[in-house]
Amino acid sequence: MKRVLSIAISRAAAALLAVSAVVSCMKPFEYGDGFGFIDPVEGTSDRPVRTPTDLKRNVLLLYSAGHTTGIPKYLKEDIDDLKTGWLPDGVGFSNDVVLVYTHLPKNVSGYSWDYSSYNSPVLYRLYAGEDGTVVSDTLCVYPPETVSASAQQLNEVLSYVHEMFPAKGYGMIFSSHASGYLPNTFYNDPGNYIYMESPAGRQTLSVSRPDVPQPVWMREGPMVKSLGYDYFRPGDYVATYEMDLKDFAAAIPMKLDYLLFDACLMGGIEVAYELKGKCGKVGFSQAEVLAEGFDYKTLTSHLLGENPYPQGVCEDYFQQYDILYGNERSATVSLVDCDQLEPLAAVCRELFAKYRNSMNALRAGRVQRYYRYDCHWFYDLYDMVAEAGADSSELARLQEALDLCVDYKAATPEFLPYSYGFSIDVFSGFSMYMPADGNVELDKYYRTLQWNKATLLVE
């Protein structure tokens, strides 16, 4: 077991932060100024110059939004596991960078959490020190009332990372509850959802009594991770915050090489298409994610180095569940190339138009689903088109477009079979909304998504 050395901001700074609402950040302990490790490039003078185009290192950020119900224990364990894996040696400009943004409730004891007061999120850097130590270097401490499930906070963290750690490439793992493309508040209370346009970037606040129904992910069965969900209970009411998919995408200030979601139900074509232009590869699950999530002990071995390999993370994720039994053998995952989505959109637009009537009359029980209970907003993209009546040549064209953008996909034969789960007989690598089993108010929101604008699934 590696030992952990924590370098934190001074006590005086911490005390000042406790009485202020201003974020406290420090510049990274790196040498030199300007850019990362670069090769000398001949200039017009006798002295060699350096250029930012020759950056060598990669940056990995784990954004762990854990001030929520059910999963703080697992998110804390994920970070602990991350510290046992391979880490860069030191903090020089030549070294890769591992950053962790974590926001957990206050820990009472063991795995008991206090939601009645706010707790400060922290951004820190992990690296290997001397004698096998793991150094946790605190970079930023944010105000206790910070909402991590907000586009504003996500943008602030990513902007800091981009500015302070110039690099060849950037990647992010997002770990929290999530509900795919669905608008804020819809997943847990679809019957009361009414679509209303809201200002971009504003997280949704829901205030209710403490005896509100449990979120879907807290119902019977193994604990699951279900974009961002902050939960506070400061008094005789409950306050929850969620982030909109469109705002999430807009908050990313630079193009990421990869974005991996350790969160439920994010594996939809709607999510991938909304992130087109924001990341090269996206890895996600079409169904829920059991709370243990990714294999954080091996994660850095795939994502650091000259050529990050996010597919390795997806492969490890699937394999760790596929060897189990019963409910625990439950996983869906795919890795998608977001730069290759246009051919799929073109084929789907044509087929959606041709088979619109039959798609709008599809019977839910005949199409591969990825949901439990009554959360019927996630079906298999390919299976919908097949059940709508597409012929063999059309399905071949659809499969060709899928093969072009889906780099990797895997699914267990069943998903939570003893907890209202389902069999997996068809797996295209994408889930999708099925209007035939949809919701009028959800249709209104769905029309605002880039996937619908490109394909007119919902007219």
Sequence positions of predicted segments:
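Bacterial Sec-dependent N-terminal signal peptides
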Residues: 1-3, 20-55
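Bacterial N-terminal signal peptides that target proteins for export
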Residues: 2-13, 285
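Loop/turn elements at helix/coil->beta-strand transitions in domains of secreted/extracellular proteins
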Residues: 56-59, 91-98, 165-171, 253-258, ...
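N-terminal carbohydrate-binding/catalytic regions of secreted carbohydrate-active enzymes
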Residues: 71-110
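Surface-exposed loop and adjacent secondary-structure segments within mature catalytic domains
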Residues: 103-139, 173-234
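Functional beta-strand-loop-alpha-helix junction segments that form "active/interaction loops"
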Residues: 128-163
